């Protein structure tokens, strides 16, 4: 059962995001990107207050670099749609289980990203989650 509302167009949009942001990280990496996106929708805190739809979350200004590149606009594949559905249905995996941010640095992961603590690295991406004081909803929305 979905933890956020999603149409088939939303599933396709999410699938395209997963591929464009993390195809090189494999299925696990794409699921982690999906976790961050769904967390942003569910948390309603920090930079993500007021997001209500997958479309809003993906096209939020400066949220995902992938939307500025042509690869994002290519058709989603069935395998990517399946991963998107798993994220939409609430499958959460460490280190993105409570993360709201990730990025791909040139070198080591900084201990903090915009004052939010580092959780772990998965392949090339560093994941960061808010403190409970900053965003308690991310810890109790599922």
Swiss-Prot record:
Query: What Gene3D superfamilies does this protein's entry cite?
Result: Cell wall hydrolase SleB, domain 1
Entry's InterPro entries? Cell_wall_hydrolase_SleB (IPR011105), SleB_dom1 (IPR042047)
The reply to whether Cell wall biogenesis/degradation figures as a keyword in the UniProt entry is yes
List the record's Gene Ontology CC terms alphabetically: extracellular region
GO terms under biological process:
cell wall organization; sporulation resulting in formation of a cellular spore
The principal location of this protein is secreted
By what means is the activity of this protein regulated?
A: Activated, directly or indirectly, by endogenous spore dipicolinic acid released in response to nutrients. Is also activated by exogenous Ca(2+)-dipicolinic acid.
Ordered alphabetically, the record's keywords are:
Cell wall biogenesis/degradation, Germination, Hydrolase, Secreted, Sporulation
Q: Does the keyword Isomerase apply?
A: no
Where in or outside the cell it occurs: the entry states:
Secreted
Per its record, what triggers expression of this gene product?
A: Expression is sigma E-dependent.
Briefly, what is this protein's role?
Probable spore cortex-lytic enzyme involved in the depolymerization of cortex peptidoglycan during germination.
Q: Would you identify the family this protein belongs to, as annotated?
A: Belongs to the CwlJ family.
Q: What is this protein called?
A: Cell wall hydrolase CwlJ
């Amino acid at each position: 059962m979905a933890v956020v509302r999603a149409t088939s167009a939303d599933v396709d949009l999410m699938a395209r995001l997963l591929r464009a942001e993390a195809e090189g990280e494999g299925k696990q990496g794409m699921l982690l990107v999906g976790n961050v996106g769904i967390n942003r929708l569910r948390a309603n805190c920090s930079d993500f207050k007021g997001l209500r739809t997958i479309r809003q979350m993906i096209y939020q200004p400066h949220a995902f670099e992938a939307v500025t590149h042509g690869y994002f606009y290519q058709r989603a594949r069935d395998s990517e749609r399946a991963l998107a559905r798993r994220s939409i249905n609430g499958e959460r995996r460490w280190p993105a289980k409570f993360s709201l941010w990730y990025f791909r640095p040139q070198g080591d992961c900084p201990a903090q990203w915009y004052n939010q603590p580092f959780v772990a690295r998965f392949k090339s991406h560093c994941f960061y989650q808010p403190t409970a004081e900053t965003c308690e909803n991310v810890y109790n929305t599922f």
